[in-house]
Amino acid sequence: MWPQPRLPPHPAMSEKTQQGKLAAAKKKLKAYWQRKSPGIPAGANRKKKINGSSPDTFTSGGYHSPGDSATGIYGEGRASSTTLQDLESQYQELAVALDSSSAIISQLTENINSLVRTSKEEKKHEIHLVQKLGRSLFKLKNQTAEPLAPQPPAGPSKMEQLQDETNHLRKELESVGRQLQAEVENNQMLSLLNRRQEERLREQEERLREQEERLCEQEERLCEQEERLREQEERLCEQEKLPGQERLLEEVEKLLEQERRQEEQERLLERERLLDEVEELLEQERLRQQDERLWQQETLRELERLRELERMLELGWEALYEQRAEPRSGFEELNNENKSTLQLEQQVKELEKSGGAEEPRGSESAAAARPVAGAPVPQGAWMCGQAGWTPQEHPGLSGEAVGTGEAAGGAGEAACHSFRAAENRELNITII
């Protein structure tokens, strides 16, 4: 015969520890119900004693008429404060009981969940074992069905051994089935116990909730009474503080009047400052416009001088043209003309130095005024940018006359440049 197989103990919790924890939980629950089983809470007797000891404390809904004395008001306040303290202590006791009951509920649910888990795991293990035993039994039946060769009897035959093993496996299956049945019954009992405990806990929570609602109602009533008492005290204090309040109001009005006057003065100062700034800006604008007018006048005077110089240059060139028309005239007149031309050239250079910032534009306009190469130029005519006559045009003039004409032409070109620069500056001034 094979030895009786035993199931391995569950690693999480053995049966003895489960029973011990369940017994401890039952004891705690029983002690809690013994402490809190009476329908009337512990604070109710106190409330009855307080209400019975002072029946005249709460009259007409818990507050006195406006004509009551101050001593009655303060006596009612002391009674309401003691009642409020009792209610607070009852509320604290109920909160502690609710916390302990919730802890017990959580512990019981954890125990039940652990028991259910262990029972499920054991059930799976037993089912696995039953399946394994069934497979081994099936194998043994197949082996017994196969014909065996006859062997000499040497002790018990193989058929007897197989029969013994089959009987042993059948007994193991029966024992495992009984264990499974016991576990199922145990699980059913635990689930039933769990449901009963949950129902009791729900009932207890409902009772606690009802007690809390009653306490809340009492607190609301007490708050209303305290509010009425506070209103009465405020009315009395207002009656006592009316003269002082009038003085305070007068002082506040005086302070407000001073603040208004100070703000008005600050606004006036700000307006004066803004007016001064505006006047200063207007003065600056007037000075700027005056400077601009002076600059324009100076520019116009300079343009007039340039026009006068140009007119003088034209007169000089006309005299030179006349002298070229008569090449055999005296050299003294040419020298005088050359001197006057050189003086004009020096004046033009001085004007160029004074208006040097505007010279690039004048050079561009002078380049634009130069004659195009190949264009016919009439003899005896003069243009800005022309360096003088050539000896081929006037073969009758000597080298000195030609040089003098070239110098005069250079002076005329410089005068044209200065004139155009002045015109450009005048144009810029007009645009601005």
Curated annotation (Swiss-Prot):
Organism: Homo sapiens (Human)
Xref: Pfam families: GOLGA2L5
Similarity annotation: Belongs to the GOLGA6 family.
Comp. bias regions, Pro residues: 1-11
Domain of life where this protein originates: Eukaryota
Record carries keyword Membrane: no
Entry coiled-coil feature ranges: 157-354
Composition bias, Low complexity: 366-381
Residue stretches of biased makeup (Basic and acidic residues): 349-362
Protein name (Swiss-Prot/TrEMBL): Golgin subfamily A member 6-like protein 9
Biased composition regions of type Polar residues, renumbered to the chain: 51-62
Region called Disordered, residue ranges: 1-77, 349-411
Source lineage: Eukaryota, Metazoa, Chordata, Craniata, Vertebrata
InterPro entries found in the cross-reference section: GOLGA6L, GOLGA_cons_dom
Keywords: Coiled coil
